[in-house]
Regions:
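C-terminal alpha-helical "lid/dimerization" subdomain adjacent to the S-adenosyl-L-methionine
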Residues: 24-25, 141-182, 187-199
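Class I SAM-dependent methyltransferase SAM/SAH-binding core
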Residues: 48, 54-100
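A conserved beta-strand element that flanks and buttresses the S-adenosyl-L-methionine
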Residues: 112
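A short glycine-rich, Lys/Arg-flanked "PGG" loop and its adjoining helix->strand segment in the class I
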Residues: 124-136
Length: 203
């Protein structure tokens, strides 16, 4: 019940914050350049952003690499609507649960997930799904919060009390373990700011 309530809180919060600076990635745009660099090395035909919010990251992908077929998934219908309005007509944005994606397997060369996994009650299920929808040889580009242990402990106490559906902040060992358990290989984890990380892994 607690987990389902976290999902509902997340959906309701982001539905009502469609135009906010936070929803548009204002606090985390610094991290996007690292994700864009990895995309540039791969140059996939198809990419999907999981937990896309209002499409701020995908707008940058579209501007930087206009030839990529862009796809998006978010649990919030309002965020999906915003994404559809901001991207070109060729982009596909879907309402769906990251832990149970309404998507066929082995479709994408790249799966991105930016500042979203800390909202998932069952992150292992979400990572398993990301692995499933990736083509063999495809890449996961995961970006989320990474803070010192005392800050993380406080955050994990506060998160369930916040309105946004935040569930848990994970440390490096937890992220690497879950990513590998999903089946990914060549896992690379690095700090990209005092408060965030990037994890790149291959299927």
């Amino acid at each position: 019940m607690i987990h389902e309530s976290a999902k509902q809180k997340s959906k309701s919060y982001f539905d009502s914050h469609r135009k906010s600076r936070l929803a548009h990635g204002g606090y985390w745009r610094h991290d996007y350049r690292y994700q864009l660099e990895e995309i540039g090395r791969i140059m996939p035909e198809r990419l999907i952003d999981i937990g896309c919010g209002p499409g701020a990251f995908l707008c940058l992908v579209e501007e930087t690499y206009p030839g990529i077929q862009l796809n998006a998934l978010d649990i919030s219908p309002e965020m999906v609507r915003e994404t559809r309005e901001r991207l070109s007509d060729t982009a596909v944005a879907t309402v769906g649960d990251s832990e149970h994606m309404p998507l066929e397997g082995e479709q994408y060369q790249v799966v991105t997930c930016n500042m979203s996994i800390h909202h998932y009650p069952h992150p292992q299920d979400a990572l398993n799904e990301m692995y499933r929808i990736l083509k063999p040889g495809g890449a996961l580009l995961l970006n989320d919060m990474d803070c010192a242990a005392p800050i993380r402990a406080v955050a994990n106490w506060v998160f369930p009390r916040l309105p946004g559906g935040d569930v848990r902040m994970y440390n490096r060992e937890e992220i690497e373990r879950m990513v590998r358990k999903a089946g990914f290989q060549s896992v690379r984890y690095r700090k990209i700011s005092p408060f965030s990380f990037q994890c790149v892994a291959k299927k």
